[in-house]
C-alpha cells in the first residue's frame, strides 16, 4: 500500500494527513547528489534499520536489522560502494547510521537509485524520524516516530512523492 507525499509537507495515508519533513530543495524529478531535494516518484520500502538500544524492533513484513556503531552509508559518487550500506571505518565519504540524535532511531531504506545505482543520482534516501520542528532534510522524508511506526504497522509498502 502506497502513502502519498506532497510538496506542502503532508503525507496522506488511509484518509489521514500526517505532517512530514522533506528535502530542503523540495520534491524534484531531476534528483542529483547533494541537491537537498526529495526525489519524485514511487519509492518502495526495501528494509528497516533501527537502534536496538533505543527502540523495540519494529513490526511489519519488511526485513529489519539493528543499526550498529560500525554501520554507515556511502554517499561518494566516485566510489564503488556509492548508495550502499557500508562498514565503518570506510575510505570514501559516508554517513554514520548510528547517530547521537534520534533521527535514525528508525529508518526505512527507500528504493531510490538502487536498481541499478547510477553515480550522482542521489544516495541515502530514507524515511526516518523527523526533528521536533520538522526542519528540512537533505532529501529524505521524515515523520514523527509514532506516525512512522503506525505506517509500518499498518502495512505501508511505498511512498509516492508527488510534485503536483
Indicate where each model-derived feature is located.
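Short cysteine clusters
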Residues: 140
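Cell wall/extracellular polymer interaction/catalysis modules
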Residues: 1-137, 147-164
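A conserved hydrophobic position in a structured secondary element of the catalytic/binding core
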Residues: 143
Amino acid at each position: 500500500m502506497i502513502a502519498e507525499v506532497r510538496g506542502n509537507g503532508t503525507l496522506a495515508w488511509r484518509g489521514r494527513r500526517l505532517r512530514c519533513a522533506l528535502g530542503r530543495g523540495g520534491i524534484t524529478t531531476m534528483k542529483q547528489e547533494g541537491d537537498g531535494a526529495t526525489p519524485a516518484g514511487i519509492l518502495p520500502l526495501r528494509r528497516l534499520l533501527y537502534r536496538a538500544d533505543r527502540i523495540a524492533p519494529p513490526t511489519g513484513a519488511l526485513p529489519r536489522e539493528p543499526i550498529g556503531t560500525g554501520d554507515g552509508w556511502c554517499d561518494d559518487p566516485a566510489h564503488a560502494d556509492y548508495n550502499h550500506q557500508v562498514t565503518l571505518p570506510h575510505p570514501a565519504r559516508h554517513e554514520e547510521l548510528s547517530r547521537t540524535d534520534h533521527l535514525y532511531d528508525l529508518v526505512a531504506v527507500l528504493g531510490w537509485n538502487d536498481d541499478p545505482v547510477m553515480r550522482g543520482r542521489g544516495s541515502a534516501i530514507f524515511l526516518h524520524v523527523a526533528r521536533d520542528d520538522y526542519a528540512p532534510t537533505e532529501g529524505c522524508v521524515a515523520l514523527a516516530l509514532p506516525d512512522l511506526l503506525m505506517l509500518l504497522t499498518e502495512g505501508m509498502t511505498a511512498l509516492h512523492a508527488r510534485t503536483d
